[in-house]
C-alpha cells in the first residue's frame, strides 16, 4: 500500500491515529447518551441533486456554485439550530418550516403535490430565490417563470434580474429596518399575497421582494432574492439552541437523556453562553455562563 489512513507503509502510526483513538474513547464515554437520544429537527433545508445538474447544464448566474451557496449562505445561518438537509423525495412530516432556496426543479418526485398539502396542513414554506424555474431536464418553462409557484404564492413576477450587485437593499414593509440582499433579484406584483419586504433602492424601489401568502392553515414565503442570515433565521419562527459565536455548530439531542453538543469547526476560539449549569461529559467539568471554546474543541453538555 502507498497510503494508509492510520498507519504508514512501515506500519508506524500517524498523529491522526492517536486522535482517532481519542475520538473512539470519547464516543464510549457518551455511549448511553447517544444511543438513548436523537436529533429532532423542526426545520428542513432542501438540497437537490437535480438542482446540481441544472446549475451545471444551464447556469443562470455568474460565478455561482449551488452547493457552496447553500452551505455558506443558507445552512450556515442555522448553525445554532437543529436542522435537517433533505432531498426532494424526503417526507415532510414532522417539519414546521421548510426552506427551498435555489431549488430550480420543484415539480419532481411528487414534491409539488406533497408540499402543497403540507402547507395547507400548517407548514411554512420559505421558497426561493430561483426555485421552480426549470424542468428536471434543465429546460425553462414557456408560459411563466415558474411551473406553479406564482399561483401558490399569490404573486405575478414583473421583473427578474439574475445579476448580483452590492447596492440593492430591502426594507420591511410597513416597518423600520433595512437589510442586505444579494445574488439575484425578482420584483413582484401582489395577486393575493402581502409584501413582507420591498426594494429600498434601485430600479425596483418600492416593489415587493419578499412576500407571504396564506394557504390553508400554513403559508408560503417567497424570496425574490437571498437576504442576510438574520432575515433567514427570522422566518424559522424559533430561537437558537443557545447563543454562540458563528464558528460553533450546536446540536440538541433529546430522548431518555438530553444534551447539547457544541463543535468548533474553523480552528479558532469561540464563545458559548449557557443558560444554567452544565456537566461537560468528556472532561467532567461543570460549566456555566459564558464559556470559551478552543479551536476544534467538542463539548458534550448535560444540564445539571
Q: Predicted regions: what is each one?
A:
Residues 1-304:
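Carbohydrate-binding surfaces of carbohydrate-active enzymes
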